[in-house]
């Protein structure tokens, strides 16, 4: 019965997809992976237990994106404000990030996935930076899913960094003020200039937490009470179905669509 229900959900998704407007295509999926600590606490375990048990949800999400030809997946792994958490938890998270990258990079490469880590690397350890650079270098020529991991990232920080970069280029005469518009500005963003189509946040929290503020301008948003370690392909299918049920207007009226 479970298998039948899952295939029925996929059939419904296909029908919705085929009848959607051409501009309503899911190219960029972004996820705020939330609830690991509360999931662990409900099981009387330390917070790192939740983080470790969330890796399977990451695997399932990546697999879904590959199967459904989603072009880009951005996962919010560690925000700039997360440095305020207890030192032991931060250390455990960084160790887990290193180990997961080390273990998963060969398989990601074999599946033609491009790995990129976006954010400020100045506070990361040399060991972790080395692993990030190895993963990026190994997969940079791949042509499949673009997997981006946001680490020590924040949307406001991203916009400020882009502004500084533009100011420096104007100062040396490489760029004129008249050349600055939304398109040119977006090219300087660490988070990239590809708009997010669908944002998912788990755990029941309903906020952006300073994540990809520029790129989320016209994103559809799906909030679920499910904790990230329990997030599955079935819940992701529901989120995608919700996305394709939406009428994306981009400033136009409903009658113009």
Swiss-Prot record:
Enzyme superclass (EC): transferase
CDD domains attached to this UniProt entry: Cis_IPPS
Residues that, per the record, bind Mg(2+): 34, 220
Metal-binding among keywords: yes
Catalytic activity as recorded in UniProt: 8 isopentenyl diphosphate + (2E,6E)-farnesyl diphosphate = di-trans,octa-cis-undecaprenyl diphosphate + 8 diphosphate
Annotated GO CC locations: cytosol
Pfam families associated with the record: Prenyltransf
Cofactor(s) of this protein: Mg(2+)
Binding-site residues for substrate, renumbered to this chain: 35-39, 47, 51, 83, 85, 201, 207-209
InterPro entries: UPP_synth-like, UPP_synth-like_CS, UPP_synth-like_sf
Keyword Transferase set for record: yes
Cofactor binding, note field: Binds 2 magnesium ions per subunit.
Oligomeric form and interacting partners: Homodimer.
NCBIfam families: uppS
Name by which UniProt lists this protein: Ditrans,polycis-undecaprenyl-diphosphate synthase ((2E,6E)-farnesyl-diphosphate specific)
Organism: Francisella tularensis subsp. tularensis (strain SCHU S4 / Schu 4)
């Amino acid at each position: 019965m479970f298998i039948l229900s899952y295939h029925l959900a996929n059939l419904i998704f296909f029908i919705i997809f085929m009848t959607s407007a051409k501009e309503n295509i899911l190219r960029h999926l972004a996820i705020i992976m939330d609830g690991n600590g509360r999931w662990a606490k409900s099981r009387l375990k330390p917070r790192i237990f939740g983080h470790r048990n969330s890796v399977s949800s990451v695997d399932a999400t990546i697999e879904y994106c590959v199967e459904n030809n989603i072009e880009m997946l951005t996962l919010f792994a560690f925000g700039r404000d997360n440095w305020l958490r207890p030192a032991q938890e931060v250390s455990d998270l960084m160790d887990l990030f290193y180990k997961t990258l080390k273990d998963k990079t060969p398989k990601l490469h074999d599946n033609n996935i491009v790995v990129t880590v976006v954010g400020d690397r100045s506070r990361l350890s040399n060991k972790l930076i080395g692993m990030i650079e190895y993963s990026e270098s190994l997969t940079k020529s791949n042509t499949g899913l673009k997997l981006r991991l946001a680490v020590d990232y924040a949307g406001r920080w991203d916009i400020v960094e882009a502004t500084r970069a533009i100011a420096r280029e104007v100062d040396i005469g490489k760029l004129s003020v008249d050349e600055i518009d939304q398109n040119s500005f977006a090219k300087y963003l660490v988070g990239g200039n590809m708009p997010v189509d669908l944002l998912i946040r788990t755990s029941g929290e309903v906020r952006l937490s300073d994540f990809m503020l520029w790129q989320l301008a016209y994103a559809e948003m799906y909030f679920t009470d499910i904790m990230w370690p329990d997030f599955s392909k079935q819940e992701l299918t529901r989120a995608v179905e919700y996305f394709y049920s939406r009428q994306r207007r981009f400033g136009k009226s409903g009658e113009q669509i």
